[in-house]
Amino acid sequence: MANYFNTLNLRQQLDQLGRCRFMDRNEFANEADYLKGKKIVIVGCGAQGLNQGLNMRDSGLDISYALRAEAIAEKRASFQRATENGFKVGTYDELIPSADLVVNLTPDKQHSKVVADVMPLMKQGAALGYSHGLNIVEVGEQIRKDITVVMVAPKCPGTEVREEYKRGFGVPTLIAVHPENDPNGDGLEIAKAWAAATGGHRAGVLESSFVAEVKSDLMGEQTILCGMLQAGSIVCYDKLVADGKDPAYAGKLIQYGWETITEALKQGGITLMMDRLSNSAKLRAFELSEQIKAKLTFLFEKHMDDIISGEFSATMMADWANGDANLLKWREETGKTAFENAPKYEGKISEQEYFDHGVLMVAMVKAGVELAFDTMVASGIYEESAYYESLHELPLIANTIARKRLYEMNVVISDTAEYGNYLFANVATPILAKEIMPTLQKGDLGEPTPTVEIDNITLRDVNDAIRNHPIELIGQELRGYMTDMKRISSH
């Protein structure tokens, strides 16, 4: 199979990368009606599989789970999750032939095997759904021409998809139809109904493409969402301890600091995050973020280039074929880092202290978010997609570190994201350690920034630069839309 994106000509590639339309709420007036009375079979019952299924059932759809015969016989975790929640469970042979929509929510590396197993069982004119397009775009999976292929990609972990639905809301979602597989012309209707059934239409839906979703998703998770947090955690902890700080305090400052700092992003973007700092600290964080950008721009661009060309996916798939040798080695190395093994700190750190003692961390977040966004946009990805794949998802990933440090982050994210994270962090960590950490000043990390004389013009210009970055402008628009949607949904 050939990488699908690489089979397209340049015009087609640019068209697919640039697919991004914010859908109007009235386009979802019929909500999930298009799929009511149809049989929907979900393959896989992990976080996305279970939680999307729960939402879809609560929206009035007929949901069952197709699992491997051995998973049922051995009562594996997927079988237990599905049965404990009252779902019908059966083998592929039992459930797939009658399915109108088969939703493949297994891990990326299992997709080719799953498709090979289910496609011969699917009835003429059925639909196949994904929540991530790697199998179609990077693997180049060829789907039978009578089958409609759609994607609904919630921009959150599965648990969040469920929690927001229970609150009467939803999570921002990308939907797409594979242009090679829309024989009846109703792919968009299927995707819209599926997105509405998960609650996504209440938070905002982008009509995108498989290509745009895959390329932007890979870029976000490799760089700012996971790679930057991993590299930043390791170098910040090592620096604090080297400076004589209590290892337990250092561990807590980093572990919970990312979540506290990025929570401000959710409410008011980079502007609000920077406004949590004193003027002296804000100017210093801005300066540090520019220094970090200067050192890491090439790495962000390399990751984007390798994602666009298919080099990244080819390298990762070679590791799949080698029994995940590199992935498992890097996972083990991460588990041995000093930060992962830091002692527990029993003392309290106030919310403001995380900002005041984490100026470098704020700078890393700012630099990483802006670099990821700018690099995606420069590669033809629309601003809305780039926003969701950088700033929007960051607080959700930071929350996983708050739970159980880097281990938890790497368990929760997909193996695809984890592999890309290590590729980035393995290069970024030594660069930050050698090029940035030795230049730090008193107050950059672990203690407050000393108050300095503030020049009005300088402060004005820095504030303008922060507020007028393109990610702040599109972010304000998209967060405003989500707030409006939440207000409408609560009435």
UniProtKB/Swiss-Prot annotation:
Pathway membership, UniProt: Amino-acid biosynthesis; L-isoleucine biosynthesis; L-isoleucine from 2-oxobutanoate: step 2/4; Amino-acid biosynthesis; L-valine biosynthesis; L-valine from pyruvate: step 2/4
Residues bound to Mg(2+) 2: 217, 389, 393
EC class of the enzyme, as a word: oxidoreductase
Keyword Magnesium: yes
Listed EC numbers: 1.1.1.86
Entry cofactors: Mg(2+)
GO molecular function: ketol-acid reductoisomerase activity; magnesium ion binding
Residue intervals of the KARI N-terminal Rossmann domain: 14-208
Catalytic-site annotation from UniProt: 132
Residue span(s) of domain KARI C-terminal knotted: 209-344, 345-485
Keyword Metal-binding part of the UniProt annotation: yes
Residues engaged in binding NADP(+): 45-48, 68, 76, 78, 108-110, 158
Catalytic function, reaction form: (2R)-2,3-dihydroxy-3-methylbutanoate + NADP(+) = (2S)-2-acetolactate + NADPH + H(+); (2R,3R)-2,3-dihydroxy-3-methylpentanoate + NADP(+) = (S)-2-ethyl-2-hydroxy-3-oxobutanoate + NADPH + H(+)
Name of this protein: Ketol-acid reductoisomerase (NADP(+))
Gene from which the chain derives: ilvC
